[in-house]
């Protein structure tokens, strides 16, 4: 079978002496791992089209239940300036990691595809990039169904008011935070009203609005810590990640 789709490279892994396994988020087929023959050779026909974050039109062949093979990759937009900004590249790589782990393979998700593509386009402008990375994480969690309910307690389901706590993937009320026995790894952590308010507001924002948003350093750091804890809880991976090893090409 022959397939064609728009795709964004999320990561690549060396395979053998000159080959690669490339992980894509595609417009039509969702998350795919594809085999690329000899792209690491100097005269490879793929050129730089398999570099992380590259947006391309790709063609591939093979049966769906096997490792399919890339036969053509034409760059639409390279996003090279993002790769060349080391700090920004690390930030986007961290966000991509949870997408790779959370998204089921070969399940189309055009909403997530366009979220990533449009976020990368805005990130190239270098206007408040932290806002766009935060937006990508929150919206990505929401699209994938991993964003916690911030309106009702995850235990008693009562409306959340005044004081908020986080435990085991849920936002809970003050009463439930003290009336249940929690394991040492799931002890309720206080969450500020500012974080809850920001979660609610982000759900209504658009990408072109983000460059006008001012988030205080204190609130931004609180939000990042909350998201880091939540992603660690629901996906179960270490908070530290060797970005060089997991997303960049050799």
UniProtKB/Swiss-Prot annotation:
GO terms for cellular component: bacterial nucleoid. Coiled coil: none annotated. It holds the Pfam family RecO_C. The keyword Oxidoreductase does not apply. It comes from the Bacteria. GO terms for biological process: DNA recombination; double-strand break repair. Keywords: DNA damage, DNA recombination, DNA repair. Disulfide bonds: none annotated. PANTHER family: DNA REPAIR PROTEIN RECO. Involved in DNA repair and RecF pathway recombination. Belongs to the RecO family. This is DNA repair protein RecO. It comes from Thermodesulfovibrio yellowstonii (strain ATCC 51303 / DSM 11347 / YP87).
């Amino acid at each position: 079978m022959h397939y064609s789709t728009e795709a964004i490279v999320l990561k690549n892994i060396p395979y053998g002496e000159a080959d690669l396994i490339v992980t894509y988020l595609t417009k039509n087929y969702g998350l795919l791992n594809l085999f690329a023959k000899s792209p690491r050779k100097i005269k490879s026909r793929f050129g730089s089209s398999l570099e992380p974050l590259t947006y391309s039109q790709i063609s591939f062949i093979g049966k769906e239940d096997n490792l399919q093979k890339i036969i053509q990759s034409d760059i639409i937009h390279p996003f090279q300036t993002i790769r060349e900004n080391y700090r920004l590249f690390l930030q986007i790589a961290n966000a991509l990691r949870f997408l790779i782990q959370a998204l089921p393979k070969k399940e189309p998700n055009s909403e997530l595809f366009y979220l990533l593509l449009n976020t990368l386009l805005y990130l190239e402008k270098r206007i408040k990039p932290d806002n766009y990375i935060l937006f990508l994480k929150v919206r990505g969690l929401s699209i994938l169904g991993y964003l916690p309910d911030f309106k009702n307690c995850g235990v008693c389901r009562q409306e959340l008011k005044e004081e908020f706590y986080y435990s085991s993937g849920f936002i809970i009320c003050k009463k439930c935070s003290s009336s249940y026995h929690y394991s040492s790894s799931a002890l309720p952590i206080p969450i500020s009203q500012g974080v809850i308010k920001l979660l609610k507001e982000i759900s209504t924002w658009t990408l072109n609005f983000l460059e006008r948003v001012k988030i205080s350093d204190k609130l931004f750091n609180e939000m990042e810590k909350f998201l880091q804890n939540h992603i660690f809880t629901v996906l179960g991976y270490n908070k530290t990640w060797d970005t060089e090893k997991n997303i960049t090409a050799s």
